[in-house]
Amino acid sequence: MTTNTVTLQTAHIVSLGDIEEAKASIKPFIRRTPLIKSMYLSQSITKGNVFLKLENMQFTGSFKFRGASNKINHLTDEQKEKGIIAASAGNHAQGVALTAKLLGIDATIVMPETAPQAKQQATKGYGTKVILKGKNFNETRLYMEELAKENGMTIVHPYDDKFVMAGQGTIGLEILDDIWNVNTVIVPVGGGGLIAGIATALKSFNPSIHIIGVQSENVHGMAESFYKRDLTEHRVDSTIADGCDVKVPGEQTYEVVKHLVDEFILVIEEEIEHAMKDLMQRAKIITEGAGALPTAAILSGKINNKWLEDKNVVALVSGGNVDLTRVSGVIEHGLNIADTSKGVVG
């Protein structure tokens, strides 16, 4: 593959070469996740060929492990010796914690005091020190930065980092390996590291691949920034897609997104719940809210059919770390509003 004029605009931030190097760097650690065809989304909804990229089957249950492992692999021996630190309420924390365990590095994770007990325990399970501090993520982040400065630890950012973006971009290379003639790729978006990496990989190969970002109506800082062409914050309420609950996107990720992403779709909370339920019922896939965003966009009918009908489409299921109580609630709500016993399965 060669870098084309489209991706040259953002090559100073992250390039195809960075992603190919990341692929080699993280290969011993990650799982190459499956890409499966959804008969339901293909035959009954889009009249296209819709495939699901199952990052919910990645180690730690999320794509975040890719970026975290690539970033940490590139630290100097001195940085590794002093230890690493991250602020996260969920998937990034587990990605950092597992990588640190595999490489024998001391890691500290600072979580908001409101972090779900299940995610606290999962992170501690990797032998990582977990500190609960702050009533919201901003307070948590500020405390984490203080600790890093005091102790000389290296911060592993969840998205606004070249090596993190490159690690996430390896998903794009895997998609191309499986479906070289993919037409449309639909990606959940929070801070933007995932879509920035994937867009770089895909557009380097074929600039005509249509890349769609999906966010919740409640929290869509990146979509707002994309259409205003200026870094902007947006959050009016919480979202079931908590993995994408990022008020202000990254500065570096935004620069990549504004050049390489084609459009954004916004979905409401009920549409995300419906997608989670349908993925469970039809495809037998358990996903968190963020992982259901691309499917929600397809089911909502908000994507122009020209990008779906007779096209090879990939919808990314970014993670599956969801509390069982939430799964139970989604199922119960779904059963109350629809008959889920009929229709195409898969």
UniProtKB/Swiss-Prot annotation:
Its EC number is 4.3.1.19. The keyword Nucleotide-binding applies. Transmembrane segments: none annotated. One of its GO terms (molecular function) is nucleotide binding. Pathway: Amino-acid degradation; L-threonine degradation via propanoate pathway; propanoate from L-threonine: step 1/4. AMP binds at residues 59-60, 94, 125-126, 321. In the native structure, TdcB is in a dimeric form, whereas in the TdcB-AMP complex, it exists in a tetrameric form (dimer of dimers). Catalyzes the anaerobic formation of alpha-ketobutyrate and ammonia from threonine in a two-step reaction. The first step involved a dehydration of threonine and a production of enamine intermediates (aminocrotonate), which tautomerizes to its imine form (iminobutyrate). Both intermediates are unstable and short-lived. The second step is the nonenzymatic hydrolysis of the enamine/imine intermediates to form 2-ketobutyrate and free ammonia. In the low water environment of the cell, the second step is accelerated by RidA. Belongs to the serine/threonine dehydratase family. This is L-threonine dehydratase catabolic TdcB. It comes from Staphylococcus aureus (strain bovine RF122 / ET3-1).
